[in-house]
Amino acid sequence: NDTSAACGYAPLTPTEEAVLSTEKFINSPAFKLRFPETGEDVKVMGVRAGGQVELTVACAFVARHVRDLADYLAKKEHAAARVRALAASSGFAEAAVGVNVADDPANGSVYLTVTGLSAESGDDGQAGRGNRVGGLITPGRPMTMESAAGKNPVTHVGKLYNIAARLIAERVAAAPGVAEAECTLVSRIGRPIGEPQIAEVRVRT
């Protein structure tokens, strides 16, 4: 197989929960039915300062569902209002949400696409750069640069070990007296997947 290192952790922080729930909300079938102009390419950055969380949302809009600039701005505000309502229920004392904040309406520059994906403008990224198997990019947490989708979809340890490490961490974190758990798995090339070179769990009580 391959030599890979994978990490998992549990539980999610309130900020991580807010970011993940926001992305899932915008990409949910119900939201797309109400706001078909919102594309599938949705990125959410969350920053917390004490009891306040600030969410910056980038959402590619689909041009065929937008009549003109005024219609784009109105539809963006309607969608943003729904996201703000969700953020307000996230448990933070204050939640601020900005959607497509790089828009420059005065110069006719807004986040409008044909497909609803930023890839059409060459922003396709590289394998391994995107979200981890849990749906988040968390630089403040243990993580690996292994691509969950890389190499092959069946036995690639970069996928399997990341999923397994997350499930192990979740199981351990659910144990009485455990506040947080992290798991690291390391595979060794030539050895069966079920025999990791390292299987380490760290807990915080």
Outline where the language-model segments fall.
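Glycine-rich, mobile lid/loop segments that gate access to catalytic sites or pores
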Residues: 1-93, 97-101
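Alpha-helix N-cap/helix-initiation motif
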Residues: 11, 150-161
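Conserved active-site/ligand-binding neighborhood in enzyme cores
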Residues: 23-31, 84, 91, 104, ...
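A short, glycine/Asx- and small/polar-enriched loop/turn
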Residues: 49-53, 105-110, 192-198
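Short, hydrophobic beta-strand segments
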Residues: 53-66, 145-150, 196-205
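A glycine-rich, aromatic-flanked flexible loop/lid motif
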Residues: 109-148, 186-195
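Structured, hydrophobic secondary-structure cores that serve as assembly/anchoring elements
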Residues: 154, 160, 176-205
